[in-house]
Amino acid sequence: DWQLLNNSVFNHKGLIDIREYDKEQVIHPEDVIDLTKQVDSNGCLSWEAPSGNWTIIRMGHTSTGRKNCAAPDTGVGLECDKFSKQAIQLHFNKMMDLLYPLIKPYVHQIQIGLEIDSWEVGMQNWTSGFEDEFCERTGYDLIRYLPAMTGKIVGSKEITERFLWDIRRIQADLLADNYYGEFRSLCNQYGLVSYCEPYDRGPMEELQIGSRV
């Protein structure tokens, strides 16, 4: 199930393993063309396609739209981008602008901590600059394999599943480094103890995120 393999579905109840597929529908990586530079600022594509049959896939990303659920009405808002240090820094510092003046007199007298509770925000599988992080961490460019994110077979079933494994690996690493790890760093800056509940079904490796906090 490609939606499970690219982490676009949450709380998935079963696997659908399609063992048979038409080999004529396999996409060869060398046949994939990156048309990004042919798209203008209005999102219009200008491209003179070579002869033959082509499928154009337009890919982008946006907020997941998920809101925090364990909060009073005045504290409900969009969840931050869990793969971005800048996102958690913005949320954390905005909160501390209001909270820290109240707890500052007690920080060095008693133990005060902040906690990330269990994962209840659905799935996330992309962030701004993900393609660059992927290349840096894996050593290869993902562009020619991106159709696999839409359920296409690229190269072969084995190659496709290996690529999607790499996708999940980088997602987990970004979550551990840029969210949980950065949370601990921010807590340390304020003299606070960091805690987390490192579990539930999300784009993470539970022991990895627990070790970051």
Regions found by a protein language model. Give the residues of each.
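Mature extracytoplasmic enzyme cores
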Residues: 1-165, 173
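Short, well-ordered coil/turn segments that N-cap beta-strands
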Residues: 108-112, 188-194, 213
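Substrate-binding cleft/loops of secretory-pathway carbohydrate-active enzymes
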Residues: 118-128, 195-213
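Long, structured ligand/cofactor-binding scaffold of large enzymes
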Residues: 162-190, 202-213
